[in-house]
Amino acid sequence: MKFIDEARIEVIAGDGGDGSASMRREKFVPFGGPDGGDGGRGGSVYAIADRNINTLIDYRYAKKHLARNGENGRGSDCYGKGGDDVTLRMPVGTIISDMDTGELIADLTEHDQQVMLAQGGAGGLGNLHFKSSTNRAPRQKTDGKPGERRMLKLELKVLADVGLLGMPNAGKSTFISSVSNAKPKIADYPFTTLAPNLGVVRVGPSKSFVIADIPGLIEGAAEGAGLGHQFLRHLQRTGVLLHLVDLAPFDESVDPVAEATAIVGELRKYDEALYEKPRWLVLNKLDMVPEDEREARVADFLDRFGWDGPVFEISALTGQGCEALCYAIYDYLSEHSDAHRAAEAEDLAADVRFRDAPPAKGGATPGDDA
């Protein structure tokens, strides 16, 4: 299935039904009085998080979602039937915002979490509500209220504890398949990974974390080059980033330091907050480096790259160093998870980047398929 992580939809709640102005007409009951019923309420539109869905593809092509109107009231004190609600099932991790106001409506972070997107209109009142001691046969009634109508932006950010960064063919997919049950496509050409992959890493009974692999970045990604810039948003919820570097590239003219520097630069251009996230350096493919050269090559890389943070030396293919890295990640997440989640919730509440400029008249909406 095609991975779609952004969509724009219109939700239209149902209008309330009109109240009825009716008089009781029955044999042997003179001056029966008013008996007009109320109109039914309009149906509302809800979103509900579903962990069994992992893409917004349904909403890329079905852009308008309408709830039913309430029925009008009738005589004999008959109230109109309420309109049926509409429920839209979305992946866990979906952020819903109003395109007109930029308001953050909901962040669906838990399975079965439900939120109202558009409220149905209230039903009108029948004339029986207007009867009084001075007005025994009222003709007044009220119309139903219109339902809410909204243009919404849906943005999926996968819920992962750890995110993988790196150039194409740095070994990210091999690493995630080595430490988890994820089965991403792996090949010896760039951009094998075309969509984010999630894997659950278990380090013991009831001890696990989720790791996200996104398509590799290249220089100029922040301006739209390559594929990775589309998916960097999926790293914004993570607690720590793993920057994988290929220490033994097939092409000897490729400089790992230059590639690593380019990744850091693109990260900073895209989002300063993402750049400030805790980041660990993971030097991969050590099995391809002769043992007598490893120490010198690692030292040379760290010296030229100017890195003073955590460093791990692994081989994703053979599994060397992967277990120690996973235990270190779990320990770090256990210590920092509570503070990270609280700060993330605070940042999301103040995030205004979901607000888009209105599309030009007659023009295509950004992100729509041709």
From Swiss-Prot:
**The keyword Ribonucleoprotein belongs to this UniProt entry's keyword annotation:** no
The superkingdom listed in its UniProt entry is Bacteria
Gene3D superfamilies cross-referenced by the UniProt entry: GTP1/OBG domain, P-loop containing nucleotide triphosphate hydrolases
One Gene Ontology cellular component:
cytoplasm
Record-linked InterPro entries = G_OBG, GTP-bd, GTP-bd_Obg/CgtA, GTP1-OBG_CS, GTP1_OBG_dom, GTP1_OBG_dom_sf, OBG_GTPase, P-loop_NTPase
**Is Transcription given among the entry's keywords?**
no
Q: Which cofactor does it need?
A: Mg(2+)
Location of region: Disordered: 128-147
Binding residues for Mg(2+), per the UniProt record?
Answer: 173, 193
Q: Where is the OBG-type G domain?
A: 160-334
Q: Name one GO biological process term.
A: ribosome biogenesis
> Record's Pfam families?
GTP1_OBG (PF01018), MMR_HSR1 (PF01926)
Localization in the cell: Cytoplasm
| Residues binding GTP, per UniProt | 166-173, 191-195, 213-216, 284-287, 315-317
- Ranges for domain Obg come to 1-159
| Molecular function via GO | GTP binding; GTPase activity; magnesium ion binding
Q: What is its main location?
A: cytoplasm
* Enzyme Commission number(s): 3.6.5.-
Q: Which UniProt keywords apply?
A: Cytoplasm, GTP-binding, Hydrolase, Magnesium, Metal-binding, Nucleotide-binding
The entry assigns this protein to a family as follows: Belongs to the TRAFAC class OBG-HflX-like GTPase superfamily. OBG GTPase family.
Q: Self-association or partners: how does it assemble?
A: Monomer.
Q: What does this protein do?
A: An essential GTPase which binds GTP, GDP and possibly (p)ppGpp with moderate affinity, with high nucleotide exchange rates and a fairly low GTP hydrolysis rate. Plays a role in control of the cell cycle, stress response, ribosome biogenesis and in those bacteria that undergo differentiation, in morphogenesis control.
Know the name of this protein? GTPase Obg
Recite the lineage of the species. Bacteria, Pseudomonadati, Pseudomonadota, Betaproteobacteria, Burkholderiales
